[in-house]
Structure formats: C-alpha cells, structure tokens
C-alpha cells in the first residue's frame, strides 16, 4: 500500500488516542453521468481506479439537490484538471461526456485501518515485527507477548480489541508468576476489555463453556470416529478421552493423534460406548491421583539471551470430566443409561452439582413439526436416564441442520443430574 494511505505515525503514543488517526487525501473522482454506464466505465477504466484495501472505489454521494450520484475514485496520480495524467480510455469517456472528472477529498480515520497498520504507526521501528498471533477461545484472545513488547502491552491489546469485533477480552500469559509453585497453570493478566475468562465455544452444534484461566479441563468423546472434535480440543490443551467401537476408526484415530502430536492430551479407546462411559470416569480419577500420570509438562519458550530455560508449564489432570460428547445421532440417546449410577462411590470426589459433567448428545428428531422437538427430545432422554427431564433442565438445544424433509439433526446439552449419577445400582 502507498504510504499516502497509511495512518499518521506517533511512536511516542503509550495510551491509544483514536482521534490522532485522521488523514485527508485529495483525489480525483469520475462522476458517471448516467448510472447505467457504471459497469462499462468500471471495467474499461480499471487501470485508473483507486485500489486500496478496505476502500471502495465506487461510492454514492448526494448532490446539492439531495439526488444520489455515483462516483468512481481514481488513483492519486490522476488529476481532474490534467487529462494527460489519465489512461486513454478515461480521457475518451471524458470527451464523450460519459464521465466528468472532479476533485474529491477522501477522509480516513482510525476505523479505516486494520490492526497491523495502526501498530506499525505507533510501535518502535527497531522491534522485529508486529505481534499478531493470538489464541482465540470464544470471546477471549490470549496473547503470549515477548519481553520487548511488554512496555506496549496495553496499547497492543486495546487495538487488538478494537479491530476484532468477536473479541471482548484480551489477556496475556504472565511468564514469571507462579514459578515457585508446583503447578504453573497459565497465570493471566487482563490487558483490555471485560474481566471475563468464562468463554463459550460452539463446535458442531454443541456449546462448550469453560474458564480459560483454568487450563486442563477433561472431555470424554464417546463416539469419536477418527477425531474431528477430539484432535482440535486436544490442541487447546484439553484432556480428551476419545473412544470409537469401530476398529478401523480407532486405528485412524491413533494415527491422527500421532500426526497432530497431541498424545499428551488425547487418550484413545476402542470400547463399547456404555462401557467407555463407566470406565473412563474411574480411569481419569485414577490418572489424576497417580504421581507419574497426574500432570503434563509443556516446555516454556525461553527469552532471547536467556542462559537457562524457564520452568515448564505444568497442567494437572483433573479428577472428573467437564463434558461428555455423544455424536451418533441415530442411537446416542440409548447410551445415556450408562450414566445411571456411574458416579456411585465417588461422592467424596464429586462434592457439588457443578462437578458433574455437561452431556452433549446428538440426536435426530423425526418430525416436520419443529415446535415439538424440545418436548420429544426431552421425553427420549428421560426414558433412558430414568428421570424426568424437562426443557428447563437443558443447558442448550441447537438445531444443527435439516437432514431430510422429516428429519432434523439436533445437539442437546444438559448437566448430568446427581440422582442419576449416584443411583444405587448401575443399569445395563
């Protein structure tokens, strides 16, 4: 992009002042006298049109009488009072009175430029690059700023927040906090936006809510297939137990774990779904209590010139699952009975309703009347759980898509009721 269209520079800025970023640029516009000629003029005068990212070359403007007219913004080299600066076709259209060249003033402001352009105008030139990389989970953007960028962290975060409409919270990992503790679990510093690390992520019609400041949640994927949900979740440092009964799917899942290098966070299983539900609950608890398997260590990138590597980030394995995912819409609800009594004997571990998992079940609703879906799905869930479940018990009911005229694909989410989890006898 030409320097002419870049924002003004202020390398002394430490607190963002959007009003500083304003620019007035004199240009030439071609007034298309008959709007029907716009496609033709746009095509044949393409070499003279203004080409700047995020700026439209065709604009609508009202004249003194309030009538709308179409203008084509031209490149800066074209002068309205010097036809020799325009391409031959543009000159020809002027002579034929198809267009009329006139002066135009382009006003640019803070909203006109993106994150990289603003940061290039305010960060010191001797910094190697603009810090652009961040991890996004729901509304939260997570930065991991290197030392040289820390004096500008609030400035960086504020601009990042402004330029990403889906972000409302920006945090930075604090490298030096917690180095003396057993678990270095992502201490966070709020840099900009709302002080809210409870994020909501949508995946294949399901809604997952978790606290980003508390890493290492555990998820059980009961019908995982080759890992389309499990692999991305493990990459976010979520402990995933992934299961599939099909030996070929299991084989592919194991291969995908290796290729994607997520073996520390993803454990594959090849079991019947009901058996997996019951066994995984006990297996995870045992893992969390075993000193040799109760945590995962992740190397922490060292700072430039640092002689000794920093302590690793240590993520403890939780004792219980936060979520169970059951994506087999034709029969997933029939496996819900496996949760009946599955937590029996674990009352000392699961000390509150909030420690019981959110269950996400995919299912079909075979009716063209979608208004009946919630009631019908709740009745199906109730039948298999052995407990009445109403619409008020659901965390979420998502219409994923219409599969056929009389069949709709849903994802329903609810927290496992305590009287089901601790039922006296497990039901086959």
Curated annotation (Swiss-Prot):
Location (main, coarse): mitochondrion
Pfam family membership, one: TRM5-TYW2_MTfase
Record-level GO BP terms: mitochondrial tRNA methylation; tRNA N1-guanine methylation
UniProt biased composition (Polar residues): 287-297
GO molecular function: tRNA (guanine(37)-N1)-methyltransferase activity
InterPro entries: MeTrfase_TRM5/TYW2, SAM-dependent_MTases_sf, TRM5-TYW2-like_MTfase, TRM5/TYW2-like_N, tRNA_Gua_MeTrfase_euk
UniProt catalytic activity: guanosine(37) in tRNA + S-adenosyl-L-methionine = N(1)-methylguanosine(37) in tRNA + S-adenosyl-L-homocysteine + H(+)
A Gene Ontology cellular-component term: mitochondrial matrix
Enzyme class: transferase
Entry keyword annotation includes tRNA-binding: no
E.C. no: 2.1.1.228
Keywords attached to this entry: Cytoplasm, Methyltransferase, Mitochondrion, Nucleus, S-adenosyl-L-methionine, Transferase, tRNA processing
Mitochondrion is among the record's keywords: yes
Localisation: Mitochondrion matrix; Nucleus; Cytoplasm
Residues where S-adenosyl-L-methionine binds: 244-245, 272-273, 327
Family in the record: Belongs to the class I-like SAM-binding methyltransferase superfamily. TRM5/TYW2 family.
HAMAP family per record: TRM5
Subunit-level organization: Monomer.
Protein role: Specifically methylates the N1 position of guanosine-37 in various cytoplasmic and mitochondrial tRNAs. Methylation is not dependent on the nature of the nucleoside 5' of the target nucleoside. This is the first step in the biosynthesis of wybutosine (yW), a modified base adjacent to the anticodon of tRNAs and required for accurate decoding.
PANTHER family in the cross-refs: TRNA (GUANINE(37)-N1)-METHYLTRANSFERASE (PTHR23245:SF36), TRNA METHYLTRANSFERASE (PTHR23245)
Protein name: tRNA (guanine(37)-N(1))-methyltransferase
Originating species: Tuber melanosporum (strain Mel28)
Lineage: Eukaryota, Fungi, Dikarya, Ascomycota, Pezizomycotina
